[in-house]
Amino acid sequence: VPEISDDEVLVAARSVGVCHSDIELLEGRYIIPFQYPLIPGHEWSGEVVKVGPSVKGLKLGDRVVGECVIGDDHFGFSISGAAAEFFTAKESWLHKLPDAVDYTNGALVEPFSVAYYALMRVGNVNASDVLVVLGAGPIGLAVTAGAKALGAVTLVVEPVAHRQEAAKKLGADYVV
């Protein structure tokens, strides 16, 4: 079990997603420079099990999710991530997980945030748009659902049958 600094908490991982970038990292070909040993895991939720003395906004038992990019560091890439039984994190990196959100869905906050950013901040998607979504993994499916909620027409390109079905269930207009 790792030791914590005064401004850190110890988190017990409760749910950790495996992103394609984690696979690239483990294969030694991720785009951000990194050095082994390194623990992957940037899509996660967990429980605070120990609190450093200068931490004021979190307490034992708090359910949390965390930031992926922290300044120059990338959680699970340039610094070790959440794919461990326990890991440390700075209070400023964490957000409380609402009681209505279970740990499994909490681990989806990061990929859903990527989809939200793409739709709302980069794409400014609205009902006049037609989107082509390349891939129906977690981020592609979140983009599909979000685009439909915004009224856009969606075309999802996905070779895997069960992911095609998931895209249809989330409202994709066309799936190829």
Annotate each predicted stretch with a short phrase.
Residues E43, D62-R63, F86, V130, ...:
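Residue-level marker of beta-strand positions
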Residues T104-V176:
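Mid-domain Rossmann-like dinucleotide-binding core that forms the NAD(H)/NADP(H) cofactor-binding site
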Residues L26, V49-G52, T88-A89, V176:
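Short beta-strand-to-turn element immediately C-terminal to the catalytic PLP-Schiff-base lysine
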Residues G57, E67-L134:
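NAD(P)H dinucleotide-binding glycine-rich loop of Rossmann-like/cofactor-binding domains
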